[in-house]
Amino acid sequence: MGVTCWKSVSDMWNYQEILVDLKPSLIVEFGTRYGGSALFFAHIMRQMGQPFRVLSVDVSQRALDPIAGRDPDITFVESSSTDPSVAEQIQRLKGEYPGRIFAILDSDHSMQHVLAEMKLLQPLLAPGDYMVVEDSNINGHPVLPGFGPGPYEAIEAYEQEYPNNYTHDVERENKFGFTFATNGFLIRK
């Protein structure tokens, strides 16, 4: 597609399988960077031939590749992913594109920010929806042990507060023996 994408190839393979199985009508991506993953998601969804929208949110759109920016099925928003206006936009898009949601969290990797993203999505995701928390492999899970509390710890904190919201898709997570989303493949109960 010609647009840079900072993702694990094995994770991207899993994501396309999840999209085909889930058939979401709305994809919510926190963390845009170049727009390569949003474009990838849009290409996969077009192959299924059903109405959909990709919403990609980032605090800065400066690095956004113009190729991705021109895609008619992607809405790029310059904002913090935890801003209440983002929740309002997701709620509106749910009305326009009813059905399943696939959410992927890959913006600020601090524990508090990821936890805030998960809490923002909590009332917006329904049973059967799918959420991936990326880069939960940092802070010693197994890489970058000195990073400090990050996405992995956010998942743990979220599950302490909301212990019955998600099941872990362990089979998908372990499929290739490596993932950037350690403990982060989550299906809403």
How would you label these PLM feature ranges?
Residues 3-189:
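S-adenosylmethionine/decaboxylated-SAM
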